[in-house]
Amino acid sequence: MCTLLAPEYRAYMQRQLAAGGPPLASLTVEEARNLMREMQAADLSTYAVTSERHKVGDFAMDVIRPADASGPLPVVLYLHGGGWVLGDARTHARMMREIVMQSHTAVVFVEYGLAPEFPFPLPLEHCYQALQWVAENGAGLGLESSRVAVAGDSAGGNLAAALTLLAKERKGPAICLQALLYPVTDFDFASGSYEEFSTGLNLDRETMRWFWDRYLADDEARKNPLASPLRASPDALQGLPPACVITAECDVLRDEGEAYARRLAEAGVAVTSVRFAGTLHGFMLIDELAGDTQAVWAMHLLVAQLRQALGTSE
């Protein structure tokens, strides 16, 4: 067990190990998806929100807003994690409601097509279509389409980073903030954090290889900055929206997330980058850990960044 883990996270990992079960990478895709859904089962009854589902082509979006909202709301376009293979509105329901209630925004939660059924670049194209949909239809739905932030966790952080690159390349729609929560930014499995945390925690090297192989199997194709944003050129990074990058100390993805934050800063992008000590990958998402001090403070940071970028009141 990693000695850097805070007591709450060490206890969580001990419970997971005691429960047994096969490694995620040994499961079928459907078994892995069901496992993630089973692990995320928060009580949502205390959240006073409304949710409307909209279907666009091959994917769907949920527009979630405070039940007492009056007037147009700025938008957080949220791209979920799960290795591009797992995750949906159910797995992220509690976290999305926290963002809505604390930031006084509307979350547009994108259920992009999952790999391997929808490999790269289809999930990213779905996210871009969702951004366009907000720009074109938001006003009629009580959304301020001129004030949009993108956010995502893990593989969703990868998609959020790539979406800002794609929106710049295609000259819009405009994005005012990119919030990247312990994001995937490269396919290099030999970074310092990959070496340090390669086995024994809730996300390991074998599992990340399993995810990448289903999203984009070809190593040469993985060099595309829209798949690996860390490989984007300085010119491509210049002029991107301000970034909030949150990383977990005990996470194979830590170093690539922080490296991307540095690359953005070197390109002149305004960046807030914070590592939360003693935490695991996914610590803001895991319902069982939602009340932990580090998870609470990370949410406070995310909300503060969203409020500042979107101009929402206290």
What are these regions (language model features)?
Residues M1-P66, A221, T293, G311-E314:
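A glycine/proline-hinged amphipathic helix-loop "lid/cap" segment
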Residues M61-P72, L230-L237:
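Short beta-strand-to-loop junctions in surface cap/lid or active-site-entrance loops
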Residues P72-G82:
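Short beta-strand element of the alpha/beta-hydrolase
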Residues R90-V108:
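Short amphipathic alpha-helix adjacent to the substrate-entry channel of hydrolases
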Residues F118-G140, L302:
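Alpha/beta-hydrolase active-site loop
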Residues A135-V150, R170:
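Gly/Ser-rich "nucleophile elbow"/oxyanion-hole loop immediately N-terminal to the catalytic nucleophile
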Residues S146, A161-E314:
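Alpha/beta hydrolase fold serine-hydrolase catalytic domain that processes acyl esters and thioesters
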Residues G152, G156, A160:
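Gly/Ala-rich beta-loop-alpha elbow adjacent to hydrolase catalytic centers
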